[in-house]
Structure formats: structure tokens, C-alpha cells
Amino acid sequence: MIEKVDVKSLNLKELEEFLLSLGEKKFRAKQIYEWMHIHHVTSFDEMTNLSKNLRETLKEKADLTVLEEELVQISKIDGTRKYLFALADGNMIESVLMKYKHGNSVCVSSQVGCRMGCRFCASTLDGLVRNLTPSEILEQIYRIQESIGERISNVVVMGSGEPMDNYDNIVKFIELLTDEHGLHISQRNLTVSTCGLVPRMKQLADLKLQITLALSLHASSQEKRKELMPVANSYELSEVLDACRYYFDKTGRRITFEYSLVGGVNDTDEDAERLVKLVSGMNCHINLIPVNPIKERDYVQSDHEEILKFKNKLEKNGINVTIRREMGRDIDGACGQLRHRHISET
């Protein structure tokens, strides 16, 4: 059986080549591209300016990735929406819509599961199942935009998975998401997270994109980082920070450091002092995240007073710092709470 072409993962030039290989005119590619990336149709039959013969050929030769919305949970606290989407193979992923005054932001998953093993994160509990394709990552945004009838203005790749562990597909996703012929989201409105895969961070830097890189730091010493994040067994903290500096040098984009505060683990005065020394002189922003509970782990959130104390210590040393607003916590839609499910679990 011949494998069908995942047309929604093709850029316009690749789509043109595919159409030419079918004996079609090149301009057809632009029409199909707009149907997929602007109108977000769910079938080839909806592409009404194509001939019936071409639509039938596309059904035979191509695959139009469409995610099925299985469940939407809405937070009673802040209106955050968590979407459960079914993939064609029966796996499921979660995505989150957050509404702000400045626009609508979507947090997307990059993998089914994750193999990084961060101790406070639900996404990694079952390990890595597979990478998501560029079209499956895009589809999370398209389905949510169609669901709410409003434009998505910001995207954060911080759902299930380690984006840099799915590097090629993430880079292609960025290309498609920011393309002027598609949704055309500004690179500056896109944030990609990583737990610190140094070679991939440098590779991304060399592309000189204008996206924000968010490093999951979570500790100010190598030993504590190893305790919380197994990836620290592969890369020293100094290597990771050097990669962050390299990213800034290449792109001019300020680095965001994500720091989950775990009660009694990484929230002491000494931790704050080490963190100050660690990022001193760097053009960065620190996002403090009160760790969110997951039932399989016994980590607890730092006391509110400790969080404020930690923040004040950083501010007094001239560091740009904020405490992340906890959105969607009551529906397990907050940072570290997204997980891989299979269709049989819903």
C-alpha cells in the first residue's frame, strides 16, 4: 500500500511540486494551501474551486490531517479551555486556550507523551509514544480557532513533549504557522520551550528566527537540576546557559527562564542567591511558576510568602521576573499538568 502524502505538512513550494507530480497546474497548490491554512477545511470535498477529478485524486494520494475534538473542559476560575483531541491512530493529545486582554493564546503539544522524565510533569509519566507531525501541531491551533470563532494571536509550544526532541517537525511547524500565505502569526508571538537539549538549541539559534526560547531551568545548581530533571545528567548547567547566550547572540531575542517553585526543594534563599549569580549579566526574564499538583508525584507548591520572597530577592538584584498566573489549574490545564491519554480512557 502506497503511503499517502501529508499535504498539510508541506510548504507551498513542496505542495507545488506534489501537484506537478500529479500532472496538475502549479497554481492549484496555492488554492489547496489556502483551503488548509486559512479556511481550515476538514475534507477535500470542501475545496470547491478544484475539479471533482482533482478532489478524487487528492483523496487517493493525499492525507488531510484533521484532529477530532473529543472533549472541552472550561475552567470555572478563569475561563481557560482544555481541549482533548483524537489523532488518526487513536492516541490523544491535550491543548489549552488562554484568553488574555491582548488576545488569544494557545498552548500546543509537540509529542504524544515525553521521554525527558521531569519529576514534576504529568506529560512524561508514560514515556514517549511518538512525535507529532507539523500538521498535527498546526491542527491544534486550527481546531481551537474554528471552535471559538476568534483569531489565535499567540502560540506557546509548552504542552506535552519536548519540542527540541522533535526538532525537524517543530521547525517545519514554525515555517507553516508564520507563513504569509497561511495563518501568518508573527514569529515574535511564538514561544518554544526546551528542557535544555544543547545541540538543538544551538541549531535553532543558527536559524536566526525571532521566536522566544523558554528554557525550563527549575534549579540553580547542577545537583538540584539532576534531582528534578534527568536531562541534566546529559548536559551541565554551564553548557545549557552557554547555549542560551549563544541563542541571544544569534537572534537578539531575550531568553525566558521557567522556574517551577517546589516547596522545600528549590525555593530557599540560597537557591535565589545562586539563581541571581547564574543569570547575572544575561538579557533574560525569569518566569516563576508555583508547581502544579499531579496525583502521581508528592511535590508541593511553595508557600505564597516564600514565592514573593524569592521574587523580591531577584528583583532587588535587577532581574526581570514575574510570577506566572495559574490558568486552568482546576481542569488540570496548567503548567506541567497536560498528559498523554489513549482514546479508551475518555
Where is each model-derived feature located?
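Auxiliary Fe-S-binding modules of radical SAM enzymes
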Residues: 1-93, 245-254, 259-346
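Short linear Ser/Thr-Pro motifs
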Residues: 75, 109-110, 123, 193, ...
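Generic beta-strand structural signal
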Residues: 81, 93, 104-108, 116, ...
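P-loop NTP-binding catalytic core
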Residues: 89-98, 102-103
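Canonical Radical SAM [4Fe-4S] cluster-binding loop centered on the CxxxCxxC motif
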Residues: 99-136
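Conserved alpha-helical substructure of the radical SAM core
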Residues: 124-154
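Conserved AdoMet/S-adenosylmethionine-binding subsite of the radical SAM
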Residues: 145-154, 159-317
